[in-house]
Amino acid sequence: MNKKETVSYCLDNLKKAGADKAACSLNMTEKKELNVEIGEMTLFRTTFNSNMGMSVIKDQKKGSTLINKTDKNSIDNAIALVMEMAEGSRPDEAYDISEEQPPQSFSKGDKFANLDTMYQSLEEFVDYVNSTYPKINLEAAIMDFNHSRLFFQ
């Protein structure tokens, strides 16, 4: 399943499980990290993280959870859990989830890290600290770039 299909799968199955109203979100994050230790560039790494949030309202009772695995089995288990949570919660007339809206796409900032600029900026920072504050022993410095994509239904 692609990302949009994963969110649709979650929402469809929440409704099949008996939710009066439901919402699902999938957050995919990529982090580029550059580290300096004792004045030397020592590490460049890329990490990926994903999590899925789901909320349901059934009989004016609410349940919510967040998972970090997005395979069908994990989603199905979380759906069962969130439905149990809703059953066990206290009803509140104020609980609500907005009606479905037309799909939209939003963007802010750069989608990709400029690795050359990251390296150069961190190198300049280390040089600046060493020349301006010679008594300081810069043990560690980290520069990172984060990019997130959120799919919500």
Residue spans for each PLM region:
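N-terminal alpha-helical targeting/anchoring segments
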Residues: 32-87
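Basic/polar N-terminal segments that are highly enriched at the extreme N-terminus
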Residues: 1-2
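Acidic low-complexity segments
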Residues: 5-13, 21-31, 76-153
